[in-house]
Amino acid sequence: MLFLGAGELGKEVAIELMRLGAWVCAADSYAGAPAQQVAHEYRALDMANAAELQALFDEIKPDIIVPEVEAIATDVLAGTAAAGAQVVPSAEIAAICMDRERLRVLAHEELGLPTTPYRFAGSLEELRAGASEVGYPCVVKPVMSSSGHGQSVVRSADAIDAAWTEAQEGRRAADEGDVSRVIVEALAPLERELTVLTVSSSAGIVTCAPIGQRQESGDYRESWQPATEPDGEAERARDIARTAVEGLVAKAQAAGETGWGVFGVELFVLTDGSILFNEVSPRPHDTGMVTMASQRLSEFALHARAILGLPITPEHVSLTIPAGSVAASHAIVVAGDGEVEFTDVAAALAEPGTDLRIFAKPEVHGHRRMAVALAVGESEADARAKAGLVADALTITVE
């Protein structure tokens, strides 16, 4: 089992796989990444470099490859899948989900899922025309980027040139010189966002209870499950997620791959109550860390079992918290430059119904997610407050 990316989510998946007897090698761009600390072996390399990635595959000869990040040479991944390695969930799905154009065409134009109005553009002139068609305000993104890089909100035609420049500078492989296509989409009247974890396994596709979330600057800060929703919203959200994953898995199986694993389906809930498809992460989702406190099996255990061909049923994704209660997670983001030390852990965990995961990342330069607090409460507000108390009680030193 070879992990491409060895962050905190990969660490939890690696642990679950090792509990089931798997041998794990964890690769990342640096040594000492969280999953490398628990794996049998590790490697450090530039996974977006085709030659380095091919050399890694030639050395390890993995049976199963688990991509945990997006910055991967997908052509090499596809070649290895064609040669017989199992890519999770598939090389084809990884390529589609990295490309907003391919994913949006599949979701809206092939599967008929509701989305914001959008256009694609390969030049500044096409972007101007597309923005005029979808209307202002609108959002401009590179078709290939992650974590909000290259994204901007455009409120008038005067800002289009700057948005084009931002997209080109923030796209994946921006130093390679090619011009990136962009997507421009209408800025929806957003009320909130949901994640629906959806599992494809040898037993078919099942969905988890929707997860609510709060973001800052495009990054996850809190999540809670089950999300508080009006009647019928949860099933509508789960139906959209199931349809999206069914479409992706069909592509994988047509290419001779399994399509097994956990998918994080991201949805928009608008002020009028309608639900729109946004994107899919073909791996465990950061908002899904809350499942370590809420479900029969966490998203990491679900991913591990699905990867190994074990069946996942509705019982495995059921909530195990008391009826009417809510679980919450709170990301602990550290700012500074140097090594990080956590103290006052006992005080942080003094609140009943709470837990903590410290990721043991070696250092921070700027801002970095270093831990997550977990809590179960009688309501969404109670659970979120308890998780926040855990985070606030920690003393964090950067040296």
Curated annotation (Swiss-Prot):
Protein family per UniProt: Belongs to the PurK/PurT family.
One Pfam family recorded for the sequence: PurT_C
Source organism superkingdom: Bacteria
Quaternary organization: Homodimer.
A GO molecular-function annotation: phosphoribosylglycinamide formyltransferase 2 activity
GO biological-process terms attached to the record: 'de novo' IMP biosynthetic process
Enzyme class (EC, first level): ligase
Domain ATP-grasp positions: 105-308
Protein name: Formate-dependent phosphoribosylglycinamide formyltransferase
Residues annotated for ATP binding in this entry: 100, 141, 146-151, 185-188, 193
Binding site for Mg(2+): 266, 279
Catalytic reaction list: N(1)-(5-phospho-beta-D-ribosyl)glycinamide + formate + ATP = N(2)-formyl-N(1)-(5-phospho-beta-D-ribosyl)glycinamide + ADP + phosphate + H(+)
Binding site for N(1)-(5-phospho-beta-D-ribosyl)glycinamide: 8-9, 68, 286, 361, 368-369
GO cellular component: cytosol
Keywords of this entry: ATP-binding, Ligase, Magnesium, Metal-binding, Nucleotide-binding, Purine biosynthesis
InterPro entries: ATP-grasp, ATP-grasp_carboxylate-amine, ATP_grasp_subdomain_1, PreATP-grasp_dom_sf, PurT, PurT/PurK_preATP-grasp, PurT_C, Rudment_hybrid_motif
Function per UniProt: Involved in the de novo purine biosynthesis. Catalyzes the transfer of formate to 5-phospho-ribosyl-glycinamide (GAR), producing 5-phospho-ribosyl-N-formylglycinamide (FGAR). Formate is provided by PurU via hydrolysis of 10-formyl-tetrahydrofolate.
Record-linked PANTHER family: FORMATE-DEPENDENT PHOSPHORIBOSYLGLYCINAMIDE FORMYLTRANSFERASE
Annotated EC: 6.3.1.21
NCBIfam families according to UniProt: PRK09288.1
